[in-house]
Structure formats: C-alpha cells, structure tokens
Amino acid sequence: MIYKFRTLHQANSLSVTEEHRRFVADLANSDAVAAKPDMSSRLIPWGGFLRSTSLDELPQLINVLKGEMSLVGPRPDVLDWQDYPMWQLRRFEATPGITGLWQVSGKNRLTFRQMVELDIRYIESRSLRLDLWILAKTITLVLRKGNK
C-alpha cells in the first residue's frame, strides 16, 4: 500500500475505481498524453492545494522508511501487470520512487509511452549522481510551482 494524502472525496462505488483503472490501461496502450482526468468536482477542501504543491506525496516518505519505495525511481504502478504491454514491464525491475526522471522531464506534457521510456532509461542508467540530479530538479520544480 502506498500512502498519500486523500485529496478527493472517496468514490461511492467501485465503478469510479474501475473507470480509473480502465483509463490508465487505455493510456498504457496508446500514445496519448498522460494527463490525469479532470476530477476537480471530487476535490476535498485543500485537495487542490495539496495536489498543486505536491504535498499529497509527503506520506510516501513512510513507504520510503519501510523500504517499500525509494526517493527516486519509476512511477508506482496502478494496474495489474497483465494490463501492461510486455515491453513496459521493465519499469517494475526497480523500487518505485516518490519522484523520478519522468516527473522532472515534462510530466504532464509527455505521453504514457514517453513516461515508461523515461522510467526504463532511469533503470538502465541509475546512479547516485542521477538520483541527486533528479532530487535537486524535483525540489526546484516544486518550489517554482509554489511561487506561481
């Protein structure tokens, strides 16, 4: 289980969860931009602030302390492995991270395919130097976003 602050009202049925899973599965098999669906109608008070400042990710530090995540790594998966094309499974060879190469390389402007390719590139070239660069770039992006 990956910890995160709740930023949306809880879905009152499994259909919303299943709808999101299908949305991600469709993205995994397309070249569409990996933008999140609009869920602004379900935001709780402060949810937009937590999301826009990336503070909703802070509880994942618990996962890091438990050894379930790392600070830097591929994006955590939301689907069962069988929902991904075979070539994308390489991204599960590393512990998922709070931030990663995808997040600092254009995040919401990239396709799902580009996200996976960046995750795989990170796995193939990971090093302390790359991790430190990604962490520094993440901090810069979060602070810059907070000043807008």
Predicted regions and their residues:
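Conserved small/aromatic sequence motifs within transmembrane helices
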Residues: 1-148
